[in-house]
Amino acid sequence: MAAITAQMVKELREMTGAGMMDCKKALVEVEGDLEKAVDWLRQKGMAKAAKKSGRATSEGLVTVALSDDGKTVAMASLLCETDFVARGDQFQDMAAKVAKSVLDNAPADAAALEALMGEEVTQLIASVGENMQLGRFARHVKPCESSLVGQYIHANGKIGVLVFLTCGKAESVDKPEVQELAKNIAMQVAAASPMALDAASLDQAAVEREREVYRQKALEEGKPANIVDKIADGAVKKFQKEVCLMEQPYIRDDKKTITDVVRETGKAVGDEITVTGFERIQLAAE
């Protein structure tokens, strides 16, 4: 059996908020597997839904760049050690330059972006005297004239969002109601941090993991075997409403879902509007 270290117990406590002895017992029960230990604690009712380990310590900036013809958009993050440096002109200029490089060069992965911008970032590190790091990035090309992108930068550049929509008619793209919808959904993604667009695009492994957690919890609580699966199914539906963008309550009116708001806007402009995807970058999640 794997040795259970104090560091493992500490990490599990940070992830779940459970007590030290409970965390140690969980790790012993699952032979040191951290992910299984989280599930074990949840099944016993000793922990809430798994949280990301550690505190947000990253500083930096998320920036967006748009092509002159408006057909391509890029978003990128540049990380540093302190907020003081993040607010400086030199750092902000470099962050904008990174996003522009993603826009112009379409790097395939982090290594490709490092090859493009790594040397310039290193020079800035030497100049400023603080460590910096290229973070996550995304690039999107509008597939047709009837598509648009909503963008939103939140919390002093610590969260950036792109939302992709398609209308049935090209003339709908420039209508104020549609433009406002795109921005509001981008704000929704920033605030509510969905995991997926809809239930169909949700990671099924995550769904089954939630189902099993609640099945085992119901069994631990002594629920009748014939209703355990119903309890688990209900928990999964609740989970989907929390993490799927189209099923989430709208932040401006929680009596409506995002699906409702999109449908209402489409009806108002006489067109069919579809949300096709989104990208979200948050510095603390780097």
From Swiss-Prot:
Places the protein is found: Cytoplasm
InterPro entries linked: EF-Ts_dimer_sf, Transl_elong_EFTs/EF1B, Transl_elong_EFTs/EF1B_dimer, Transl_elong_Ts_CS, UBA-like_sf
The UniProt record lists the keyword Methyltransferase: no
Gene3D superfamilies from the UniProt entry: 1.10.286.20, DNA helicase RuvA subunit, C-terminal domain (1.10.8.10), Elongation factor Ts, dimerisation domain (3.30.479.20)
Keyword ATP-binding: no
Main location: cytoplasm
Pfam family, one: EF_TS
An example Gene Ontology CC term for this record: cytoplasm
CDD domains: UBA_EF-Ts (cd14275)
PROSITE patterns found in the cross-reference section: EF_TS_1
Gene Ontology MF annotations: translation elongation factor activity
Domain of life the protein comes from: Bacteria
Keywords: Cytoplasm, Elongation factor, Protein biosynthesis
Ranges where the record places region Involved in Mg(2+) ion dislocation from EF-Tu: 82-85
Family: Belongs to the EF-Ts family.
Biological role: Associates with the EF-Tu.GDP complex and induces the exchange of GDP to GTP. It remains bound to the aminoacyl-tRNA.EF-Tu.GTP complex up to the GTP hydrolysis stage on the ribosome.
UniProt name for this protein: Elongation factor Ts
Organism: Desulfovibrio desulfuricans (strain ATCC 27774 / DSM 6949 / MB)
Encoding gene (name): tsf
